[in-house]
């Protein structure tokens, strides 16, 4: 503070002490009915929240005045939410003692710290998304990566062997906040994911937070299991990351977080891997440009009716399975619901009444729940028996398993409804929340408040009868409280236990012990009732908190049922089929459709297409055709169908047989990375390099216009080299859809046995070009570029001139011809193809056995190659 320390008030010193311990937070300091902010916190809050900045100590010189601003306590959550959304941390400092009964300085302390990754308030969260905080720890070339959504209790940890895997996992969970420390955590790939791709809040950790012994002790104490039981024994990076994250959450929440009851270790081998480019290009959860849910795959598939189901659907989409049996169980459950429309309809109606069990339970455990939340929870519990009944009517083993996992929680619903009034106030400390009949002491206090006048009248009548004083009255004033008034004419009849308090001209005023006790009861009944109701509420809250495990298991089962019901509803509505998942390598799709494009088309039918990929003679599909014809849509369609199938969904096709795919890679579109100063071509090459490094023979590659960011010859050479590498069984042999404008690459079908040409059919009618949107075998030698330019609205004079130039180029033979032979498998490279061929030829020559004439012939061949 600007004020000298010796001149500070006790409250100001108290503020300084608390602020000193929370320097990275904006401190909301409770003063009566307001939360006040001071100094730099006030300046920041005033700017970000559009608050009026004022000062304390206005009588002092300006340089000694303290900037301040404040917000009302009853609307504080909305202000906190705005700051957290902007990336700030907020520390909430509450009054721990009642100012009305406290002599001297009110005790204050931090009750919680709100950060982007630790929010639990419903008004600050998207109910359909998890809100993860992550912890990244690097050591010895490995990375421990832990994720926790404190609002639901979900806690995951994994170990990554390289920065690319870290980036992929960060993309999968999309945390709001990341704590990082250790070797390699600032690698470019990771930092790019954190800052540019995710834009999340990054906290730089310090060594004291990442100690193995402390992490082991904390994890074993919290989860009441040893590391072997937790599944992370010997995995030091995972242990340290998990322990550091849990400690941060405990420090921030000021709570034991008993709803975080399971640490789930997972390996990358359990789920299909999707890097951040694939997630973006396939528009799984949001569109690339508008960043909106509408227009994404999630938008099409999300017919869930519970908040938990919405979050789980997103999770299934982010984590397609690699276990054929588990995938099949999901498909079986969806099929069961597809074939039973009555059950599906009744289940849907029951799910609509289920509240967000996970997040309400978290607010119960963390002490931030209110009575309205509890009544909503009870209504959700009341819907559970019907959910169980409908699942019992199904035949799917998975649906039966979910039914068995659902606890109807009738006892909890009864307790809540028998305790809380039907329409409670929003706050829990102001009374009026406990139902009549729930507690005898509360009822008695309520009777005292409601029947005070009746009690007084009863005492007055009783005293008249006992004393025989007809004029006796019981009255009240602020000086004496309740008193008995007796006229002078009856003074000799006043009982000895009456205590005289006042003498007036015509009467005397007395008090009795009974009246003083009544006064104490009546005057303090409201305050005592309010305190008692809060005590009853906290007892109810603590009882419910002990049911966290029951509620969470039920919530997970309900969420899964909701997702399966959603997928079934979409399958019926859109005419999807059950895919067959195999351990083979082939993808066979009959009449496949793009799920999103089909959904947005209103007056036009989507043109379906077949896909046959992965066989010995059809490993790589080269797709040619004009811009706007639908190449990119088709390739994305195939990738989305594969992903949908492996997440457990039916797919938009007449039939589909899909060999398990471990990774989907995409190289689609072109854009400069201005933030890092990289050109379009550099971005493209970096993505291609990553694909070729991490893809396997089980991967699906979607490659669109490789090489177009550079000159024609360089681009064509690179495109061909990448194609050869992907097709080569010795190098990669991955299933590949390869769209290109380099029509010369169509000759690869004759050179490589597992490459096939396809094109997008186009029909010309006079000067008009009609896109048929149909994939047909064979290559096309015409890009229809000028026709597309005409459709785009290029002026006719420019179009005419372009036709003249094209005729001149074609007459001069200006089209590039690719005449080089296919390089040997061990020669495929991204370098210049001619140079590579010369090197390969030289390496193949055995100089010791070469005759002079053979040497001359070889030299002639090399010279011809260079020409």
What spans do the regions from the language model cover?
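Intracellular alpha-helical coupling/juxtamembrane segments of multi-pass membrane proteins
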Residues: 327-330, 350, 354, 448, ...
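ATPase nucleotide-binding head domains, primarily ABC-like/P-loop NTPase cores
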Residues: 39, 235, 305-306, 310, ...
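Conserved catalytic alpha/beta cores of large enzymes that bind or transform nucleotide phosphates
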Residues: 170, 175-183, 514-547, 650-653, ...
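Charged catalytic and DNA/RNA-contacting regions of genome-maintenance
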Residues: 1-336, 345, 352, 356-365, ...
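Amphipathic heptad-repeat alpha-helical coiled-coil/stalk segments that mediate oligomerization
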Residues: 210-220, 272-276, 288, 379-458, ...
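Terminal-proximal interaction/regulatory segments of ATP-powered molecular machines
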Residues: 477, 843-867
């Amino acid at each position: 503070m600007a004020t000298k320390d010796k001149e500070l008030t006790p409250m100001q010193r108290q503020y300084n002490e608390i602020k000193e311990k929370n320097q990275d937070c904006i401190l909301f300091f409770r003063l009566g009915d307001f939360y006040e902010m001071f100094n730099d916190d006030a300046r920041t809050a005033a700017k970000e929240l559009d608050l009026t900045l004022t000062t304390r100590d206005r009588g002092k010189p300006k340089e000694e005045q303290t900037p301040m601003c404040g917000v009302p306590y009853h609307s504080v959550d909305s202000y906190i939410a705005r700051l957290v959304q902007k990336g700030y941390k907020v520390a909430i400092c509450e009054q721990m003692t009642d100012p009305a009964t406290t002599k001297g300085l009110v005790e204050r302390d931090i009750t919680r710290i709100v950060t982007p990754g630790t929010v639990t308030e419903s008004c600050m969260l998207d109910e359909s998304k998890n809100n993860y905080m992550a912890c990244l720890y690097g050591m010895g070339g490995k990375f421990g990566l832990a994720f926790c959504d404190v609002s639901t209790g979900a806690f995951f940890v994994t170990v990554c062997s390289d920065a690319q895997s870290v980036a992929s996992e960060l993309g999968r969970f999309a945390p709001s906040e990341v704590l990082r420390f250790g070797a390699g955590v600032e690698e470019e790939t990771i930092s790019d994911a954190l800052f540019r791709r995710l834009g999340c809040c990054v906290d730089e950790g310090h060594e004291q937070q990442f100690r193995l012994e402390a992490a082991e002790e904390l994890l074993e104490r919290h989860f009441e299991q040893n590391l072997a039981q937790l599944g992370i024994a010997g995995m030091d990076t995972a242990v340290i990351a998990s322990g550091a994250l849990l400690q941060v959450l405990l420090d921030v929440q000021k709570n034991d977080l008993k709803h975080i009851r399971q640490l789930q270790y997972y390996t990358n081998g359990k789920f299909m891997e999707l890097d951040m480019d694939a997630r973006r290009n396939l528009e799984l959860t949001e569109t690339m440009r508008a960043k909106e849910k509408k227009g994404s795959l999630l938008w099409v598939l999300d017919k869930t009716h519970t908040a938990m189901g919405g979050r789980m659907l997103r999770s299934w989409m982010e984590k397609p399975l690699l276990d054929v049996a588990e995938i099949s169980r999901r498909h079986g459950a969806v099929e069961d619901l597809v074939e039973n429309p009555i059950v599906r309809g009744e289940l849907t109606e029951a799910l609509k009444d289920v509240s967000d069990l996970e997040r309400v339970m978290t607010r119960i455990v963390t002490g931030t729940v209110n009575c309205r939340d509890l009544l909503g929870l009870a209504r959700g519990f009341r819907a559970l028996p019907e959910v169980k009944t409908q699942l019992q009517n199904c035949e799917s083993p998975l649906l039966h398993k979910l039914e068995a996992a659902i606890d109807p929680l009738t006892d909890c619903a009864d307790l809540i409804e028998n305790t809380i009034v039907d329409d409670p106030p929003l706050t829990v400390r102001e009374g009026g929340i406990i139902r009549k009949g729930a507690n005898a002491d509360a009822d008695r206090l309520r009777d005292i408040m409601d029947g005070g006048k009746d009690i007084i009248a009863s005492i007055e009548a009783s005293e008249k009868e006992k004393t025989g004083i007809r004029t006796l009255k019981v009255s009240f004033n602020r000086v004496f409280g309740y008193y008995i008034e007796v006229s002078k004419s009856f003074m000799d009849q006043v009982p000895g236990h009456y205590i005289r308090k006042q003498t007036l001209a015509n009467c005397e005023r007395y008090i009795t012990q009974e009246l003083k006790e009544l006064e104490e009861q009546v005057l303090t009944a409201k305050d005592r009732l309010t305190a008692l109701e809060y005590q009853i509420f906290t007892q109810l809250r603590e009882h419910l908190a002990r049911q966290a495990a029951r509620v969470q298991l039920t919530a997970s089962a309900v969420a899964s049922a909701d997702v399966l019901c959603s997928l079934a509803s979409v399958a019926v509505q859109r005419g999807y089929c059950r895919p067959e998942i195999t351990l083979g390598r082939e993808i066979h799709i009959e009449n496949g459709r793009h799920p999103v494009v089909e959904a947005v088309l209103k007056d036009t039918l989507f043109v379906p297409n077949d896909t046959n990929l992965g066989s010995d003679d059809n490993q790589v599909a080269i797709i040619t055709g004009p811009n706007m014809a639908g190449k990119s849509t088709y390739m994305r369609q195939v990738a989305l169908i594969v992903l949908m199938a492996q997440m457990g969904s039916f797919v938009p096709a007449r039939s589909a047989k899909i060999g398990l795919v471990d990774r989907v890679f995409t190289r689609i579109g072109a854009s400069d990375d201005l933030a890092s100063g990289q050109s379009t071509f550099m971005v493209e090459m970096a993505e291609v390099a990553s694909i070729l490094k991490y893809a396997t023979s089980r991967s699906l590659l979607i490659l669109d216009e490789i090489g177009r960011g550079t000159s024609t010859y360089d681009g064509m050479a690179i495109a061909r080299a990448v194609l050869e590498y992907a097709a080569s069984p010795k190098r990669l042999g991955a299933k590949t859809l390869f769209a290109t404008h380099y029509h010369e690459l169509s000759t690869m079908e004759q050179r490589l046995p597992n490459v096939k040409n396809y094109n997008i059919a186009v029909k010309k009618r006079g000067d008009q070009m009609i896109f048929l949107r149909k994939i047909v075998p064979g290559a096309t030698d015409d890009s229809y570029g000028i026709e597309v330019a005409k459709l785009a609205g290029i002026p006719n004079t420019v179009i005419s001139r372009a036709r003249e130039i094209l005729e001149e180029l074609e007459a001069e033979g200006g089209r590039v011809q690719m005449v080089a032979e296919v390089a040997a498998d061990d020669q495929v490279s991204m370098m210049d193809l001619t140079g590579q061929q010369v090197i390969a030829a030289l390496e193949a020559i055995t100089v010791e056995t070469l005759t002079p004439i053979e040497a001359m012939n070889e030299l002639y061949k090399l010279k011809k190659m260079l020409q």
